[in-house]
Amino acid sequence: AVPGDWQAGLVEPDEDASGMVTFDPETQEGFMLIKGLKPNDPRRELYQLWIWDQDREPDPANPSPLADNVHPVDGGVFDVSAEGEAIIPIDAKLVIGKPYLFAVTVERPGGVAKSDKSQVPIIAQPKPDA
């Protein structure tokens, strides 16, 4: 399995959020534990997980997650309740070979096929020894 800890994101970061994510490329199963992420109103917005896969990179030896030609895989949508803690199974829409970055974005109800990454409250990078 590939584990990583959540940290503040790149755009509109959530400094209070914590937790971890783990994903096993062999079984294509994983989950997220998130604490302290701002609750969302499902009628207005939801959270969506994105997974960057080194195997899908144009140049796998030099991954560049912010490049325009790099498209992360949709890992599923979820809500965070007023309790602010959630355990969410990962629902990757495509097979993931070598995940190297996980990010949560804020999107419209129903989710999106491609995020504009205008709100990225938390990210996680797999631990080097994983």
Where are the language model's segments positioned?
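N-terminal targeting/export leaders
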Residues: 1-130
